[in-house]
Amino acid sequence: MEEHSYIQKELDLQNGSLEEDSVVHSVENDSQNMMESLSPKKYSSSLRFKANGDYSGSYLTLSQPVPAKRSPSPLGTSVRSSPSLAKIQGSKQFSYDGTDKNIPMKPPTPLLNTTSSLSGYPLGRADFDHYTGRDSERALRLSEKPPYSKYSSRHKSHDNVYSLGGLEGRKASGSLLAMWNGSSLSDAGPPPISRSGAASMPSSPKQARKMSIQDSLALQPKLTRHKELASENINLRTRKYSSSSLSHMGAYSRSLPRLYRATENQLTPLSLPPRNSLGNSKRTKLGEKDLPHSVIDNDNYLNFSSLSSGALPYKTSASEGNPYVSSTLSVPASPRVARKMLLASTSSCASDDFDQASYVGTNPSHSLLAGESDRVFATRRNFSCGSVEFDEADLESLRQASGTPQPALRERKSSISSISGRDDLMDYHRRQREERLREQEMERLERQRLETILSLCAEYTKPDSRLSTGTTVEDVQKINKELEKLQLSDEESVFEEALMSPDTRYRCHRKDSLPDADLASCGSLSQSSASFFTPRSTRNDELLSDLTRTPPPPSSTFPKASSESSYLSILPKTPEGISEEQRSQELAAMEETRIVILNNLEELKQKIKDINDQMDESFRELDMECALLDGEQKSETTELMKEKEILDHLNRKIAELEKNIVGEKTKEKVKLDAEREKLERLQELYSEQKTQLDNCPESMREQLQQQLKRDADLLDVESKHFEDLEFQQLEHESRLDEEKENLTQQLLREVAEYQRNIVSRKEKISALKKQANHIVQQAQREQDHFVKEKNNLIMMLQREKENLCNLEKKYSSLSGGKGFPVNPNTLKEGYISVNEINEPCGNSTNLSPSTQFPADADAVATEPATAVLASQPQSKEHFRSLEERKKQHKEGLYLSDTLPRKKTTSSISPHFSSATMGRSITPKAHLPLGQSNSCGSVLPPSLAAMAKDSESRRMLRGYNHQQMSEGHRQKSEFYNRTASESNVYLNSFHYPDHSYKDQAFDTLSLDSSDSMETSISACSPDNISSASTSNIARIEEMERLLKQAHAEKTRLLESREREMEAKKRALEEEKRRREILEKRLQEETSQRQKLIEKEVKIRERQRAQARPLTRYLPVRKEDFDLRSHVETAGHNIDTCYHVSITEKTCRGFLIKMGGKIKTWKKRWFVFDRNKRTFSYYADKHETKLKGVIYFQAIEEVYYDHLKNANKSPNPLLTFSVKTHDRIYYMVAPSPEAMRIWMDVIVTGAEGYTHFLL
């Protein structure tokens, strides 16, 4: 609201100030603009290849330059008014003031009037310096940048049309949303404010409607006054709007433009040419019946009226008759083509040229033909400052018309306002964001490539920066590859390079890397740099080819780069009339380069051989590891099978135990059934005798009674025996059940333990299988890596051979058909340090001295002598060295090319640096090459590290002594074979004899894997025969000493191996002894545990047998409370009225079977703990005592489950009281009374005292 009030206040102030002198200022501005338009000016701008979301080709970009005729005559000349641009201090924001001074202008308005030379691209600061004088007043008004500017990096999205300037433009245009919805503004007249610019349909119609209402309210009081001012100025002049008047907002347009009703005061702002130039045949195939009749004219041109925040041009008859206007609507068939056109647009030069072409086209003397118009429009598609871009649906639905009013509404397709759902909107935003990110990446890579090329150009002129050009060239090549991946098609570069002038291209590439202050000097630099910046495809190739002519620093790690650089550096670049001295220098340089290439060849061969050895070693290790894992897996599988067998045995044992117990129970039951049958027979016999006794005569009654008495006694004895047997059978069954339970639990524990062991072994076997698979896969990966590295080395070897062949051809061409000499003295070693070359040459200013090489043989840097020979003057000592070498060559001191090469230095300075097995050796007067790192003559450190690594892995994995000794033997053989196969030549021809004995064996070491014996053994007799006799004697002495050293070394290794073997044997013996002791200890512990468990089980079994089958033991305490004891047992005494219990007594009726005569009679029983008797009476008065049972006679009380009671009134309520003499059968009146009596009587069953412990 504050911002709105500020804008309204400024509008009122300017209206008041401009009303007075509006006519005078408008006349002055018209004349001044005419003069400026007649003066030819070429506006230069800097094009940034900006492919981010700000200028995304997938959005609709509207360009609306409108030609306006000064007179209604068709022959009138269209005068183009140049835009007025103000240079704003502190930023690159320029504004175009396309309005008269009598029309009110608000401060933020220049945001919409800001122009650029190309599709909304910011203009260079130096390109518009000539406008600052006239527009200083306007620059003061524009010095304050709106907070929501399109130049702000935070607000570059499709909603940026609602910046402050956009709000002002919308207020100026009146209620345009009502026009869009179908309403009319005919009563309001033409809009009062005339501005140039473009805006888009807002993303949210609701927000646009809200803002439009505010606009109409804000502009209502001033409508009449503006109408009068507009009518006064309409006859003074009409403005011709430049082609970039709509470029800013058009570049940010994210939807279709707003439509409005064409009134009589409005000119159709924009016309579209046919799509023939784009090659789209759909345009011509579609019938005109697809569009309304009011849209199509005779020339098939589509009149697309657009009014948003821009000015409404005044309609004249001349403008209606001209079907061509200075701006076209380029409608690409897809966002891909739109992006291509946006990237291909170059500079404002093309825009101005096209404006001139449009100007010529409107002139009657320069009318455009059909072919010319196509060419102009095709050019415009690539050079247009603000081309409107539609998608495929809009292209097929559009037609051109001129001179006819457009309908009130127009169907909108594929725009953001036509999106109906949230998912469509999110997809629309996602596509635009991905496009912006991709184009930002293209911009970044392009800028990085250009900056790298410019830095290369800056370093190219410096002689000291030759060493860093190689990596920069690689950076350029890498950036070019990434750009090729991101480029849309080959047509983009064709459009871009074919249509871009060298001057424009240079300024485009230099814009991002130069500061703003340097932009003014781009015009002068463009002429000198036009010849350098050719199109991209040829420009980069020429630049890279020039840069590769400078030799990069050679390195043994990259033999190809070293050899190629040295080969390129020695190519003759002098005219044919060179002197003999220069030719000889070039030939010598070629010889040195040949030595480097030969050394590289030998090194590559050695590396290939080392890789083969590593592959063999990897195979051997894989076999050994797989064999170990296989053996361990087999042992685990065997143990697993054993444990499974033990588990099956335990299961069988459990089944057998169950079966045995069932058999025992069956036997006892059969025995008990036999005793029961016998007892039943005796009872039947006794019953028969009783019946006979009743029927027998008196004479036989006495005899029968005696017999009946004997039978009764026998029956009583048998019944007691049966009861005892039954009791024993029950005890036996309980004991069997207990044993079964204990044994079953033990067996189940063992079963569970073995099952856990089986599961763990299965997991271990699975882990072993996974480990074996992992080892095989790892070995396969290593093998693939070795094969890849070997292939790379073979390719490098082939390149070196090709370089050598090319070098020999060049040497032959320079030397007149002669080949390379075979003199060994001319074949210098490639591993020469820089100070070694600088000392004989006497000049060490350009190159830094190097006194020590790295230890790694693969990383030893080789310095070709060519660069030094070409850049440094030759000294007298060097010429003397050359003369000595020529003399030796004439004397025949040379070897064949197949023999090893030696390193020869000048006789003045024989010192050199050497690296042997990772140790730096100080320069010495004499050092055999057997200890130098030439041609891979020593074991590479990578092989030694590989051997040590494999040995440590074997020791960690616990290999036995045989495997260790075998590994040592193979390693020693591998070392000897590697050293003996290396090519070494003994340098013994140019050194004095007095220094031999002092310094010959300075580098000899027993720890080194290299040996002088193997190095010298490679020398053939031909090598030695050319030396003197003293040299032969020296060599023989050396061989003898080396043999002794080698024997000593072998002896030390053997003694060390024997010591390790003894230690390992002792360790294994100790380990075996400890395992035996641990096993014995475990066995004894398990045996002891078993004995303890067995004793405990025996004691528990005895204690269980001491307890009788009765429920409670007798109680003999004096303070025993019988009533509380019964209640504690769970009985409810109060509800059982058949029994009366006190603390010491229990009374109640029971039915008792007689002893002699088996009759059942009801008796009153009294259990008295004071008298310690269980007596029964005839009635409850306790007067007539019928019998007494003492506590000492009661043995046990139990329920009559065998139904032994004869003719019991109620067998279910019958229980027995066993004494020493007889068994009393009693029947309780109720079940609760029976349970209470049994618990009471058992407390006095003191006949069980012998079972107590």
Curated annotation (Swiss-Prot):
Modification sites for Phosphothreonine: 504, 550, 574, 898
CDD domains: PH_PHLDB1_2
Major subcellular location class: cytoplasm
SMART domains found in the cross-reference section: PH
The protein's assembly and partners: Interacts with FLNC. Interacts with AMOTL2; interaction may facilitate PHLDB2 localization to the myotube podosome cortex that surrounds the core. Part of a cortical microtubule stabilization complex (CMSC) composed of KANK1, PPFIA1, PPFIBP1, ERC1/ELKS, PHLDB2/LL5beta, CLASPs, KIF21A and possibly additional interactors; within CMSCs KANK1 and PHLDB2/LL5beta appear to be the core components for targeting of microtubule-binding proteins KIF21A and CLASPs, whereas PPFIA1, PPFIBP1 and ERC1/ELKS serve as scaffolds for protein clustering.
Domain characteristics, as noted in the entry: The PH domain mediates the binding to phosphoinositides.
Name of this chain's protein: Pleckstrin homology-like domain family B member 2
Natural source organism: Homo sapiens
Organismal lineage: Eukaryota, Metazoa, Chordata, Craniata, Vertebrata
